[in-house]
Regions:
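Signature of N-terminal electron-transfer/Fe-S-associated modules in redox systems
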Residues: 1-136
């Protein structure tokens, strides 16, 4: 049994410690906002926050999480998250939407840490997120 704190709630899941966090989030907890894209931490669709930092949940095992606090797209809140989500919609960013949760999670982490990022900061923070339909 593995103990996880997801979105501020404590869970105990019956999982092998090597199970990717992504599958615990989606299959065991039913939180499907976090997407599976490539499975090799290259596309960013599976991005969640671990203690406020963006990580790729497809390559992070539940055993690696330890006492960390995981936040998924379902639970991001606060002014930064609300602003990013509003601008995302206002600027018609979503097309197919597959990359959207990972893109938003990376953007929220960036703006939370750096209120005035440069173009280079933005490129660096978002470079791990790929968009299948190329609308980003």
């Amino acid at each position: 049994m593995i103990k996880l704190n997801i979105n501020g709630k404590d869970f105990t899941v019956d999982a092998d410690p090597e199970m990717p966090l992504l599958w615990a989030i989606r299959d065991l907890l039913g939180l499907t906002g976090t997407k599976f894209g490539c499975g090799i931490a290259q596309c960013g669709a599976c991005t969640v926050h671990l203690d406020g930092q963006p990580i790729r949940s497809c390559q992070t095992s539940v055993g690696e999480v330890g006492d960390g606090k995981v936040t998924t797209i379902e639970a991001i809140d606060g002014k930064v998250a609300q602003t990013i989500q509003a601008v995302w919609t206002e600027m018609d960013v979503p097309q197919c939407g597959y990359c959207q949760s990972g893109q938003i999670m990376s953007a929220v982490a960036l703006i939370t840490e750096n209120k005035k990022p440069t173009d280079a900061d933005i490129d660096n923070a978002m470079s791990g997120n790929l968009c299948r339909c190329a609308t980003y």
